[in-house]
Amino acid sequence: MRVKTFPSPQAALAGALAWLMENLLYASCGVLAGGETPLPVYRALARQGVRYPGVLLLSDERWLEPGDPGTNLYRVGQALGPLRERLLPFPLGLSPEQARDWMEERIRPFLPFDFALLGLGEEGHTASLFPGSPALGSSRLVEVAVGPTYPSLRLTLTPKALSGTRLVLFLALGPAKRQAILRVARGEDLPPNRIRAEEKWIFTDQEV
């Protein structure tokens, strides 16, 4: 795991945008994080008018009603603009177990992924893979998981699905993330270190 520190959050977001645009040029399938942190990157990507013929996956999804503004699909889709048409969403109209099985079969042909832009939580989670979660050791590609905040029920890509990805970038901004960055960079047994990729980076605005 390599860490690149930028002088400001804006500079780190610009770095993530450049990384993402470069990878979209050559990728057939990539993974995007939900949550607040990467949304400015997606909005900037939409403003660039980038055309991408491949498939985009969400790293995880919150178990809410389809179309709920709290879903990652809604928020990431709004930010991506026209590129939202490239998203392959989790099917929230099914049961969690049916959605897990459906998604697993759909993503299997795209393995290994070309890139993954992921987040990093204060306690070291990424996607909906939280420390101690049974999903970390799952032999499946997609799992039903439980998070600490509402909605607690989630669907998430597993380390098995994400391992083998060519390039993985964790975007972690703000002083609240500093300890998690340090722990991941030291190689502690946290979810980001369960993902085996050809190249892994953390982009941050924190000195570590």
Per-segment meaning from a language model:
Residues 115-118, 122-160:
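Class I SAM-dependent methyltransferase SAM-binding "motif I" and its flanking Rossmann-like core
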